[in-house]
């Protein structure tokens, strides 16, 4: 795992805490070996061992249906810029101003241009929050593999993970390359071959198109806020930040509001729990 994590986090790997390991199965060497031999899971499963998504459609279906129910209260194309903690006021980058009894923020805290009404020591916590940027790039071809996810620890290969879409979702085509922002340029220059014999690399070399193919593969998007990093001291910093804001009816929610590595199914559950609490208050 070390080569993969060095590739994922680069120099930031040494800044990470250990509290996030609760997301991983707790297994011994014997249990790992037994899992490989029997093709069955062993060991203690993490708190989030199962993922819950709609049985039909994609997980985006949740947001599509919510938007229909909430329209016209849903406003698109507006980006929050300033937050006033005393007045519970949000100003967008285009100048619109909103005030509310309760403010729920799901955006990265360090993406606000300005936060007022917050003491300097609390505001200083924002500088401690770290995140990574990831490019997702679509390649319109199929791979000769039955895998849904492929993890790539080789530092000579730009991407760290592949979502094999045609195995993941019935009727779909192609696959997605996930590449850390700092390694994206390598996609344009790639001209490598995997080491080892052909049998070991069955399906692996299919991924290596030439540089022009990757450059013109199709849709690609750089997400500047892909993952919050679980750095040392982050839980304590977020507890202080969220407690201060909560006392002023401002709530951080979800992956970015809580700066916690949640998947979307967990965020939906947390949002429903918060809605119930606010309705009862």
Place the predicted regions along the sequence by residue.
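Mid-domain catalytic core of redox enzymes
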Residues: 81-88, 92-207, 219, 237-244
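FAD-binding beta-loop-beta segment adjacent to the flavin cofactor pocket
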Residues: 223-259
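Aromatic-acidic/polar surface patches that form glycan- and anion
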Residues: 52-59, 96, 128, 260-267
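General small-molecule cofactor/ligand-binding pocket signal
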Residues: 73-77, 216-219, 251
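Active-site-proximal substrate-binding core of FAD-dependent oxidoreductases
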Residues: 220, 279-281
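Conserved strand-to-helix beginnings and helix N-cap segments that scaffold or border functional pockets
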Residues: 187-190, 231, 264-265
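A conserved FAD-binding loop/helix module that cradles the flavin
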Residues: 253-279
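Active-site/ligand-binding neighborhood in enzyme catalytic cores
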Residues: 1-88, 106
């Amino acid at each position: 795992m070390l080569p993969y994590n060095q590739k994922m986090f680069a120099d930031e790997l040494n800044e990470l805490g250990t509290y996030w390991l609760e997301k991983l199965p707790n297994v011994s060497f014997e249990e790992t070996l037994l899992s490989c031999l029997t093709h069955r899971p062993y060991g203690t499963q993490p708190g989030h061992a199962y993922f819950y998504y709609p049985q039909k459609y994609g997980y985006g279906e949740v947001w599509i249906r919510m938007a229909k129910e909430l329209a016209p209260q849903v406003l698109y194309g507006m980006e929050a810029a300033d937050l006033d903690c005393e007045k519970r006021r949000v100003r967008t980058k285009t100048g619109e101003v909103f005030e509310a009894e309760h403010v729920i923020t799901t955006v990265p805290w360090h993406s606000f241009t300005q936060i007022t009404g917050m003491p300097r020591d609390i505001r200083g916590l924002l500088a401690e929050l770290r995140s990574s940027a990831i490019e997702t790039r679509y390649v319109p071809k199929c791979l000769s593999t039955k895998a849904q996810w492929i993890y790539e620890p080789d530092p000579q290969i730009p991407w760290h993970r592949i979502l094999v879409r045609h195995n993941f979702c019935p009727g779909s085509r192609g696959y997605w390359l996930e590449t850390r922002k700092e390694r994206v340029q390598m996609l344009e220059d790639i001209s490598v071959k995997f080491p080892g014999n052909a049998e070991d690399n069955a399906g692996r070399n299919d991924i290596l198109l030439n540089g022009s193919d990757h450059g013109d593969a199709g849709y690609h998007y750089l997400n500047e806020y892909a993952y919050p990093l679980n750095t040392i001291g982050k839980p304590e910093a977020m507890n202080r930040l969220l407690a201060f804001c909560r006392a002023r009816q401002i709530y951080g929610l979800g992956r970015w509001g809580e700066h916690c590595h949640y998947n979307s199914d967990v965020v939906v559950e947390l949002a429903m729990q918060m809605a119930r609490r606010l309705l009862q208050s």
